A protein has these predicted regions:
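Active-/binding-site microenvironments in catalytic and ligand-binding cores
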Residues: 5, 10-277
Length: 277
């Protein structure tokens, strides 16, 4: 993992309380939705607080985060929040003061606030303080490759077997898969692999657009618009995830296996090269 100059030795400080009014529910502007190429951003801290001071609902978003960690919200963010089958970004937040925050998880609340969970290696940020966000570039690129690869597998299935309805997508490393109603078998792997390879070779553009109204929870922004991802105009999927600009940039997609359970078939895939073993 890239640490952006953050010391791996994290210093312990007394747990802090909120630096702003807890009733503040200002939605975070998620800039990655409009420009996924951003890797650093200067913004302003809205709150910095201990995890234990969050509501029970908000604490449930960070089940595997140590209780002694902290959470920071800011006016804007380039950090992708876990959801839509994709893990969150990680990285660091720094300032011109001796305060750095290492981000280990980002989650979005129902009211549109992005909670950046992690650890300080110095004194906490103050409300209104200017800070610089830096995301782990290699991890973002890998997650974007996996997510775009999932859409490519989905388009291949749509072109080959349009009668198969997609029921679930998972773009996590080592778990990436697409699930469909009905039965598929390992004998179908070569056909799916061939179509996937063809779509990668065509180097089709990944097109992002916004439509008014609600086409499903995935891809919806807090203002009610829906973000649509399309591969060369051949498909249109509500999607809030990050993507590479073109299919040719995913690397090689490997259809690993096809499995079945209770009438649902899972097409497991990976991309190569990746950064996470």
């Amino acid at each position: 993992m890239t640490h952006y100059g953050v010391s791996s030795k994290l210093l312990l400080y007394p747990q802090h309380t909120t630096h702003t009014n807890m009733s503040n529910t200002e939605a975070t502007e998620a800039l990655y939705l409009h420009d996924a190429s951003l890797r650093d951003l200067t913004t302003e801290v809205i709150s910095s607080q201990s995890i234990t001071s969050l509501s029970e609902e908000e604490q449930s978003l960070a089940k595997n985060v140590p209780a002694e960690d902290s959470v920071v919200t800011m006016r804007e963010t380039i950090f992708y929040a876990q959801g839509g089958g994709q893990p969150s970004d990680t990285g660091a937040i720094g300032s011109d003061q001796p305060a750095t925050f290492e981000v280990t998880l980002v989650r979005k609340t129902p009211d549109g606030r992005y909670l950046h969970f992690g650890k300080y290696n110095n004194v906490p940020f103050a409300m209104g303080q200017k800070v610089v966000q830096k995301i782990d570039d290699s991890k973002r690129n890998y997650h974007s490759q996996l997510h775009t690869a999932g859409h490519i597998v989905g388009l291949a299935m749509q072109l080959l077997m349009p009668e198969k309805k997609k029921v679930k997508a998972n773009h996590f490393p080592r778990e990436a898969s697409m699930e469909y109603e009905g039965l598929l078998y390992n004998e179908d792997k070569p056909t799916i692999q061939e179509k996937v390879d063809e779509l990668v070779r065509q180097d089709l553009a990944i097109l992002i657009s916004w439509v008014e109204g609600e086409e499903g929870e995935e891809g919806r922004s807090h203002d009610g618009r829906t973000r649509i991802a399309s591969i060369g105009g051949l498909d249109h999927n509500p999607c809030g995830g990050t993507h590479v600009p073109r299919t040719g940039l995913v690397g090689s997609i490997i259809i690993r296996k096809i499995s079945r359970q209770k009438g649902i078939s899972r097409v497991s895939y990976d991309v190569s090269p990746g950064i996470e073993g």
